[in-house]
Amino acid sequence: MKFFLRHVILIVSFSSIAQTFTNPILSGAYPDPSICVVDGDFYLVNSSFEYFPGLPIHKSKDLVNWELIGYGLDRENQCNGTNNLVDVQSNGGIHAPTIRYHEGIFYIITTNIYSPVKGPTQFINFIITAEDPAGSWSEPHIIEGAPGIDPDLFFDDDGKVWFVGTHDKGDKNANGIGELWVQELDLTKWQLKGERTSVWTGACGGCCLEGPHMYKREGTYYLMAAEGGTSFNHAVMIAASDKITGPYDSNPRNP
């Protein structure tokens, strides 16, 4: 009987733990999540592709219960002109945003993929800002000369701001055998500056290298990215370096 009761108690205990949350924590179309935390509140942004309003923003205090508080793109004048969402294709639009917070300002950096009827596919990397993540958000600041997709924005502790990007080694606007690159970014002019440095080709030959995110902990830079495409070979890789411009050492346990 004691054996039975002990196991019943354990089962009930584990059941209680399991019922505290269920995956997915957000049901529906919320791919490519990016999160930042400010004063104990978590803010989440996701890809929205061709849909409008775009860039849904959720807020949570526990990473389990989320409230939709607004959209990064909710005005027509944010989505026409260079940053065109008016007639974007069903496989285009807003991909893999990153949300960051620095000195009182929220930033979202992302790519709009647009394929005109005539001409090559365009990869438009841009940033929007807000003091309140619920909105309103600024007009898009287009980062000219930034190739590739899925950019990250990194604020270093020396005051420098870095654009972390990806591009194809052969065609800088394709998504084949890729590499990751970093370049300093001037947020007063919304322009890249200085030298662009290719820093890593991933752990599996750079196939479909995408979604980079830069972190820094105890003086070491950690560069995380996805690789292998979006099917069975999709995997997460990470590498480390003492300098943001590399060289980066791939984790031997990748992928």
What are these regions (language model features)?
Residues 18-255:
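Carbohydrate-active catalytic/glycan-binding domains of CAZyme proteins
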Residues 1-20:
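Bacterial Sec-dependent N-terminal signal peptides
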